[in-house]
Amino acid sequence: MGAHSVFLILFSVIAIAIVVHGQGQAGFISIDCGSPPNINYVDTDTGISYTWDAPFINAGVNLNVSEEYGYPKNPVLPFPLADVRSFPQGNRNCYTLTPSDGKGNLYLIRASFMYGNYDGKNALPEFDLYVNVNFWTSVKLRNASENVIKEILSFAESDTIYVCLVNKGKGTPFISALELRPMNSSIYGTEFGRNVSLVLYQRWDTGYLNGTGRYQKDTYDRIWSPYSPVSWNTTMTTGYIDIFQSGYRPPDEVIKTAASPKSDDEPLELSWTSSDPDTRFYAYLYFAELENLKRNESREIKIFWNGSPVSGAFNPSPEYSMTVSNSRAFTGKDHWISVQKTAESTRPPILNAIEIFSAQSLDEFYTRIDDVQAIESIKSTYKVNKIWTGDPCSPRLFPWEGIGCSYNTSSYQIKSLNLSSSGLHGPIAFAFRNLSLLESLDLSNNNLKGIVPEFLADLKYLKSLNLKGNNLTGFIPRSLRKRATANGLALSVDEQNICHSRSCRDGNRIMVPIVVSTLVIILIAALAIICIMRRESKIMYSGAYSGPLLPSGKRRFTYSEVSSITNNFNKVIGKGGFGIVYLGSLEDGTEIAVKMINDSSFGKSKGSSSSSSSSQVSKEFQVEAELLLTVHHRNLASFVGYCDDGRSMALIYEYMANGNLQDYLSSENAEDLSWEKRLHIAIDSAQGLEYLHHGCRPPIVHRDVKTANILLNDNLEAKIADFGLSKVFPEDDLSHVVTAVMGTPGYVDPEYYNTFKLNEKSDVYSFGIVLLELITGKRSIMKTDDGEKMNVVHYVEPFLKMGDIDGVVDPRLHGDFSSNSAWKFVEVAMSCVRDRGTNRPNTNQIVSDLKQCLAAELAREPKSNHEKKEVVKEKYTKTKSTVQNYSSNEYNSSSGSVSLSFGDYSTFGPMAR
């Protein structure tokens, strides 16, 4: 039996026999890279639970180390080092880690490498590591049995962390194990805040007796190496030392031992040399008093670097550990740290442990978020068989295969995309349109079907479009032909399948008579049906006004009928600028809501006069009635009918038992509105908006998206209502139309307000405000303690900059939510309210992102009642509410008050730069 088989059997037995004890390892990600599929086990040396790596990466091959270096010849070989994942293809291959604590938190990331001649070449490779888009370190091995360990402390800039291996032409990259550990985000501070990562240089246990300090002794699972020169003594204690006083939490076996010089008057000295004098080093020194000092004894210490003081004099505590670090980076070639006793000290200096890190700047930029979302959608839609992991454009030396980028701005942009011969199937996806800065697109030699979509003409910077070698049919859109004719676009298509207007006309001569004849027959039949239905309508409503015919299931009511079904307008269930809403009941008992339109209905446009209000009401009533007849979606309020008999106007909807979202959030009912329910409401509303933008032909922009226009039924399912201000766009063009500004203060898109240009992103802005109201429980416009008006975006800004998601979330949730889900939700909301509409996501992306938020919430464990109370108590102690819920009905907007401008929040919270 081969060595690998023996090891695998033993490996499986241990994996089955040991109960995986993940408790205490909350937030740990421990990956055995290259392990067999579906293998999960507990490492007997560390007690750490490891898992296979396929869920984290879809590239590379799994291989075992050679028999010479594996089990049983090496019986003490740690399980994670017995196999590797190797990456013979692609310049950059990335593991995708999604830590449970999400963005804004500090993590220790550790990668392990043992070559073990896994490829039989006896050739030690050299390659680089990156975290996200920034360089981490180079991996160099001295021999095949060496276990090279690399560590970095890094703040997560998003919910996803990419750890990438980069081939630099010196051998095939590989990896044995990858680990992530959540840290206390307040420790390991530097003068650069969170704008650097810290790469481990050394971590020494200077009073080492035995052990490594790893988990479970070290809650952060740091690996401590022994360091004890012959000129040092070692002291220890068995007494209690509080390691939790400080967030650094050194393990007992490390802090309870210390080094001291053999001569009491000598210092403790450490030195190292840097090959790069510009490297910035930070040292973290650990101290605790281990001796019972007498009354006439004292230990007072000062720390020096290259002769300059790092700290003032201090006395190590016998009760708890303390950590001292340099506030300014150490730079230069030669470094010398000296721990000395002061003149007043009777006892020699001590040092329990030390960590030294080099600071790695986060200099690289990320790809523009809209481009990332678009290319990820393309990747998912077509299941692109390329090594597309990590950021598409960054680091700039290693973009994705087939992608060309522009690196002239603070965010990189995709300029060219070559997917020729990539096995693409199906129609040309709408996601290509969202690569708005694209100059060259090559989709040739695939199996794309359907028409050439007109939205490709929206790519205004496109200079080259190659669609040859596909199964596309139909006309070339006029807008594309026009650009190609004007020599602004190099267009390549298959002439035999895709036709210009003249050639298609000749080819369709036979079809024209058939189509015309069919249409004539259909028209005659339709006229006959209409005549019959009109006659029946006159009988049913004898004496009533005969207006447009309503579709099946919709009714036109007379005023007397409206009065009857509302019991003479007996019960008011809502009021607003449009008029009053009454509860009604149809003959079959179905409850309905009757919205009576008054003469001051609907929002006035910017610059409108009162003299035009009556005609405006009539126009908006007509717009809403016509739209309600044509739109049908489960997340749009269902339309029953209307009344317009010359005296009164009314719109009649299905009754929504829980009223509108604005009132519900302000009521006592909101106490029971869990985070999961809020996410469902957000998704429902987003889907309704998505239907208006992308499911209707022609598209519709609502123009008055707000919590008051989102209705809730008895199951808290959300439906968008009130289409009086809606705008129908010509054909499928959602670029923009110039129109008077209408909407509600606090929700109006500032870009629309200032330019009069309306498009779908105006609705997206308003929806971003709705999302912020959902998560905060605040109104779109509120009052501060000093009586000033504040928009909800400005309310959340300071919390995001501090990375305080608890400060953002509605306290009525009592802390019972997934922080990962909440951060993602706020990220979506803030992306919706970016200054420029082009930088906001479309509703397709919003729906997708919100579903991810829901998935994260459903995956978590709910908090206990005790935990909820503690969260609320802590939150109210930290931040008393300085903003009160404020009714937007009290707010009368001037032109300036809705002309709001907010910063770009593609990155925010603790990682805002």
Swiss-Prot record:
UniProt catalytic activity: L-seryl-[protein] + ATP = O-phospho-L-seryl-[protein] + ADP + H(+); L-threonyl-[protein] + ATP = O-phospho-L-threonyl-[protein] + ADP + H(+)
Modified residues (Phosphotyrosine): Y653, Y752
Gene3D superfamilies in UniProt: Phosphorylase Kinase, domain 1, Ribonuclease Inhibitor, Transferase(Phosphotransferase) domain 1
Coiled-coil features, chain-numbered ranges: none
LRR repeat segments: 413-434, 437-460, 461-482
Ranges facing Extracellular side: 23-509
Annotated keywords: ATP-binding, Glycoprotein, Kinase, Leucine-rich repeat, Membrane, Nucleotide-binding, Phosphoprotein, Receptor, Repeat, Serine/threonine-protein kinase, Signal, Transferase, Transmembrane, Transmembrane helix
InterPro entries (UniProt xref): Kinase-like_dom_sf, Leu-rich_rpt, LRR_dom_sf, Malectin-like_Carb-bd_dom, Prot_kinase_dom, Protein_kinase_ATP_BS, Ser-Thr/Tyr_kinase_cat_dom, Ser/Thr_kinase_AS
GO molecular function: ATP binding; protein serine kinase activity; protein serine/threonine kinase activity
Principal location class: membrane
Residue ranges of every copy of the Protein kinase domain listed in the record: 567-877
Keyword Ribosomal protein (UniProt): no
Membrane-protein topology: Single-pass type I membrane protein
Positions with biased composition (Basic and acidic residues): 862-877
Localisation per UniProt entry: Membrane
Signal peptide per UniProt: 1-22
Biased composition (Low complexity): 879-896
Record region (Disordered): 862-896
Residues carrying covalently attached carbohydrate according to the record: N64, N143, N184, N195, N210, N233, N296, N408, N418, N434, N471
Active-site residues, record numbering mapped to chain: D704 (proton acceptor)
Residues annotated for ATP binding in this entry: I573, G574, K575, G576, G577, F578, G579, I580, V581, K595
GO cellular component, one term: membrane
Record bears the keyword Magnesium: no
Transmembrane segments: 510-530
Name used for this protein in its record: Probable LRR receptor-like serine/threonine-protein kinase At4g29180
Organism, as annotated: Arabidopsis thaliana (Mouse-ear cress)
